[in-house]
Design a protein with these regions (language model features):
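Short beta-strand immediately N-terminal to the Walker A/P-loop
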Residues: 38-39, 85
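The feature captures the beta-strand-to-loop junction immediately N-terminal to the Walker
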Residues: 41-43
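Helix-to-loop junction immediately C-terminal to a conserved catalytic motif
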Residues: 56
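Conserved ABC transporter NBD signature motif
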Residues: 64-72
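ABC ATPase nucleotide-binding domains
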Residues: 82, 88, 92-233
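Non-catalytic connector elements of ABC transporters
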Residues: 257-354
């Protein structure tokens, strides 16, 4: 196991770079403590897999360093880095038994067979593969095959980190939840550094203690799931996390006042000055309520999810979604909205006012 540190990492697949768009990732700085559960979250093409492949040694970064336990390992090859990597699609040996698949990494390292037997049975029990150990791997279902891939990463006790690149892509939605829960349980048992790459917010937020959100090759926020939900530091984090995502509305800054649709609203921050090209207010649907005064809107539709109602409204400057209690009476036609001050934030050029 190891503490993983990334310092000033940037990478481009082009020989020359003339703009930010030429970089797959840029200016990445991360500290992941030994034994933690982490997630890299972002849409396709944001640089997640590039970053993962740099850590494992499959790609050499254009700039920056990778450190394990404060030692620079940028020049080491993938084998020397001692990383276990689990990919989107199960990588198994079909003609081997499940037992032999799990034992394979240990046999490559000349581990004594008795020790291999103990370790394989331990991991098989954790992953509920014990009853299939003598079966050929080709006979297993998609989730069973991915369990083998997970097991081969977990069976080694000498790895510096275990990295998962969208490991549940091919898994049925119900089985995803089961495997994700099992992975979380395994992390608590073996206490190894795990880095989970995904575009799925549910996977990231339920697995990781700390989530790194990436957007267009940059890290826009790192924090706990609660941090990311309650205080998005970038409007992208607000859009991307939450269902529905954060409402983001254009606003004007007049002195220390924040104006939305001609109405002054109170926000979490005290505004001192604004020299941004674009200013916006962000508030999640959970923190908006109907009121006798406030932002004027027109109620467009109401969807009952069973747990709550999602109300679509429209204001002068854009649509606003509200999450209301399932038994709450929703006005029809014209209405007014009030934003909860503690969770209403002002953004300048997409970044939160600090």
């Amino acid at each position: 196991m190891a503490k993983v540190t990334l310092k000033g990492l940037s990478h481009s697949y082009l020989k020359t770079q003339s703009s930010d768009a030429d970089w797959a990732i840029r200016g990445v700085d991360i500290d992941w403590n030994d034994g933690g559960a982490y997630a890299l979250l972002g849409p396709s093409g944001c640089g997640k897999t590039t970053l993962l492949n740099i850590i494992s040694g499959l790609i050499t970064p254009t700039k920056g360093d990778i450190l394990f336990d404060d030692k620079v390992i940028s020049g080491l090859n993938p084998v020397q880095r001692n990383i276990a990597q689990i990919f989107q699609f199960p990588v198994i040996y079909d003609t081997m038994t499940v037992y032999d698949n799990l034992a394979f990494p240990l046999r490559n390292r000349k581990i004594p067979e008795e020790e291999i037997k103990v370790k394989v049975h331990e991991i098989a029990e954790m992953l509920e593969l014990s009853s299939t150990l003598n079966n050929r791997a080709s006979s297993l279902t998609a989730d069973g095959k991915q369990k083998i891939s997970l097991g081969r990463g977990l069976v080694r006790s000498d790895v510096n980190a275990i990295m998962f690149d969208e490991p549940l892509t091919v898994i049925d939605p119900h089985l995803k939840w089961i495997l994700r829960s099992k992975l979380k349980e395994l992390h608590q048992k073996i206490n190894r550094t795990m880095i989970y790459v995904t575009h799925d917010q549910t996977e990231a937020l339920t697995f990781a203690d700390q989530v790194v959100v990436m957007h267009e090759g940059q890290i826009v926020q790192t924090g706990t799931p609660v941090d990311l939900f309650e205080k998005p530091k970038h409007t992208f984090v607000g859009y991307f996390i939450g269902s529905p995502g954060m409402n983001v509305l254009p606003c004007q800054i007049k002195g220390s006042d924040v104006i939305v649709n001609g109405k002054k609203i109170e926000t979490h921050q005290k505004i001192k000055k604004s020299n941004f090209d674009k200013t916006e207010v962000g508030v999640r649907p959970e923190f908006i309520s109907f009121s006798n005064e406030g932002i004027p809107v027109k109620v467009l539709s109401v969807s009952n999810t069973g747990r709550h109602k999602i109300v679509d409204t429209e204001s002068e400057t854009g649509k606003i979604k509200i999450i209301a209690k399932f038994n709450e009476d929703i006005p029809s036609g014209s209405a007014f909205l009030k934003f909860k001050k503690e969770y209403t934030y002002t953004y300048g050029d997409s970044w939160i006012f600090e």
